């Protein structure tokens, strides 16, 4: 079970480089839209600055002179206000357009990221999914993507707006009065220092919060998948205790992150008020004395700029939290995208074929015959080798980690039509051998040949297309029964689907479902029994009509009565095909042509049932022990 050990707080590596990569990704797909957003942003800021500068003109050139006139004429004032109103209207329209375009850019970027992530994930090797918690991967698609949504739609536009506003307002303040500008800049420096201290303290906790959320999601998924085991062993209290530890860890990181993050804006707001008071005090004295031509109108404009100058600083400090969280999420997203995809240096492909006058040729029509198309790299000549299902392991060594071998000197051969069974205790290497046939993993030493061809030369998609597999853990997709069976051969007709179901003896129970073959399965087929789910998996393998079958404990979860029904169909399916079977019930492999007994990654016995029983070795012990049960 998981403990509550806490390591050092994680940090985002190269945040600047990460931010640049994210911005490049956005601009690559929506560059023109981003340019329009920046233009709209400049128009918005320009209209705001012009409106503030007009305040000086309004007071000094219109209001004060008009108060001194006996019969004031407001015509020129009305014209001036009209011109400013046009500026403000342009700013409002630009701000509206900016918001609309950013929604489009944000949602489009997230859609592209999800697409890129999923496409890339589908190309990753099985090793990645064996070594990364599925909850962590799911958190990347949900929580991390959501933090990016906030950053792209809110933080980035706000940061740009604030930056342009700061530069524009600073220029206007310098023009109005340099001493007051120096006071304002000094207070801004104090605010930036506060932002650095408080923001730096919160950043590490926001990063940890993202990691802790992924950990909690992973644990919840783990417990959901293992609920039966939890209840059988009455481990509810232990699982709750472990969850509470992880949840408390998440609470601690989230509490610390928001504790620091939430005080940053109030601190800067109060410092902004101090700046405003200082400027008002000094500026009032300058205006009353008329020093340097400083007027009440200029003071009014400067005070507004002072607030406008501190406001973007506050907004920047507020967005720091979102940016840090988003960078932590984007780091995980780009880590997924940077994972090396499954390599495939094979060049031998599987093609439809026909045989005429003893010669195998490639064709496009369905003939029921397949062949390996071997284009020799040396001279470009082409050989066609009939797909039969001849599999040979030649002195194979393999380890999931190179420094720890799990298979040693494995030699085996299976000719077309043979049924090869692997037996042995858990962890002996039975399933590993089938993983190597699929090239889910590549061997460290030795050779595996398929119809005389080294499987490293065969393209992985074509290799796997030639194999029918029933995995130990049956997985059904959210689709109809017919679509789940058709997954083994996407262009199969309805008649072929039904024929495969009959072969697997699944047709009877399918007709008993509410909508028969059109019954929608959800939740991994949760409304079906384990035996029914396994029958559908066998039908899925049957429809592929492969020359080689891999049955990884295909009947180990089926009751005895169902097993007999399945076995009858499987015997028909296996006829004429090379079949590798792994089963704990040794009675299901008695009729195998060859039984191989594995122990600690080595084949220690081989032969048919009668031969192995006569040897009184490991197989004899397993078999008699099985009967004794």
Name every feature range the model reports, one short phrase each.
Residues 29, 33-46, 154-208, 279-294, ...:
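Transmembrane helices of ABC transporter permease
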């Amino acid at each position: 079970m998981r403990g509550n050990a806490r390591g050092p707080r994680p940090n985002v590596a190269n945040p600047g480089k990460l931010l640049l990569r994210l911005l490049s990704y956005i601009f690559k797909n929506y560059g023109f839209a981003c340019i329009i957003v920046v233009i709209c942003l400049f128009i918005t800021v320009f209209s705001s600055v012009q409106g503030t500068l007009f305040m000086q003109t309004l007071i000094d050139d219109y209001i004060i002179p008009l108060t001194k006139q006996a019969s004031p004429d407001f015509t020129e004032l009305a014209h001036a206000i009209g011109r400013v109103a046009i500026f403000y209207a342009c700013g409002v329209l630009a701000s509206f357009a900016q918001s609309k375009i950013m929604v489009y850019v944000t949602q489009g970027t997230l859609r592209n990221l999800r697409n890129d992530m999923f496409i890339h994930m589908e190309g990753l090797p099985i090793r990645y999914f064996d070594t990364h918690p599925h909850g962590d991967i799911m958190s990347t698609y949900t929580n991390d993507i959501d933090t990016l949504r906030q950053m792209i739609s809110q933080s980035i536009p706000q940061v740009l707006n604030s930056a342009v506003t700061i530069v524009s307002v600073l220029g206007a303040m310098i023009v109005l009065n340099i001493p007051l500008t120096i006071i304002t800049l000094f207070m801004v420096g104090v605010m930036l220092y506060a932002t650095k201290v408080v923001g730096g303290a919160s950043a590490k906790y926001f990063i940890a919060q993202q990691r802790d959320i992924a950990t909690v999601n992973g644990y919840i998924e783990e417990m959901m998948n293992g609920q039966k085991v939890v209840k059988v062993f009455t481990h509810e209290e232990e699982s709750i205790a472990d969850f509470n530890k992880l949840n408390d860890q998440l609470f601690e990181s989230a509490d610390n992150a928001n504790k620091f993050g939430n005080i940053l804006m109030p601190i800067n707001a109060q410092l902004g008020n101090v700046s405003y008071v200082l400027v008002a005090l000094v500026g009032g004295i300058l205006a009353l004395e008329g020093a340097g031509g400083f007027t009440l109108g200029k003071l009014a404009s400067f005070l507004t700029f002072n607030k406008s100058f501190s406001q973007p600083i506050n907004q920047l400090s507020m967005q720091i939290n979102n940016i840090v969280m988003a960078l932590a999420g984007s780091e995980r997203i780009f880590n997924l995208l940077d994972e090396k995809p499954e390599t495939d240096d094979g060049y031998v492909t599987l093609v439809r074929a026909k045989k005429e006058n003893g010669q195998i040729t490639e064709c496009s029509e369905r003939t029921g015959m397949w062949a390996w198309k071997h284009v020799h790299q040396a001279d470009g000549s082409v050989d066609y080798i009939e797909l039969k299902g001849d599999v040979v392991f030649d002195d194979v060594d393999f380890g999931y980690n190179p420094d720890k071998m799990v298979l040693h000197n494995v030699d085996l051969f299976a000719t077309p039509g043979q049924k090869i069974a692997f037996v042995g205790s858990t962890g002996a290497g039975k399933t590993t051998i089938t993983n190597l046939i699929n090239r889910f993993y590549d061997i460290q030493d030795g050779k595996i040949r398929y119809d005389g061809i080294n499987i490293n030369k065969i393209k992985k998609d074509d290799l796997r297309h030639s194999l029918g597999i029933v995995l130990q853990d049956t997985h059904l997709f959210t689709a109809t029964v017919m679509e789940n069976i058709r997954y083994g051969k996407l262009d199969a007709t309805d008649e072929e689907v039904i024929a495969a179901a009959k072969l697997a003896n699944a047709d009877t129970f399918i007709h008993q479902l509410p909508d028969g073959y059109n019954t929608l399965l959800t939740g991994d087929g949760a409304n079906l029994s384990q035996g029914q789910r396994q029958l559908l998996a066998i039908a899925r393998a049957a429809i592929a009509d492969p020359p080689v079958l891999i049955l990884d404990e295909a009947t180990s979860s089926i009751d005895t009565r169902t097993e007999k029904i399945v076995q009858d169909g499987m015997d028909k399916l296996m006829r004429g095909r090379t079949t590798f079977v792994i089963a704990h019930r040794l009675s299901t492999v008695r009729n195998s042509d060859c039984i191989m007994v594995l122990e600690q990654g080595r084949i220690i016995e081989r032969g048919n049932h009668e031969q192995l029983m006569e040897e009184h070795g490991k197989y004899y012990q397993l078999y008699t022990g099985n009967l004794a049960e």
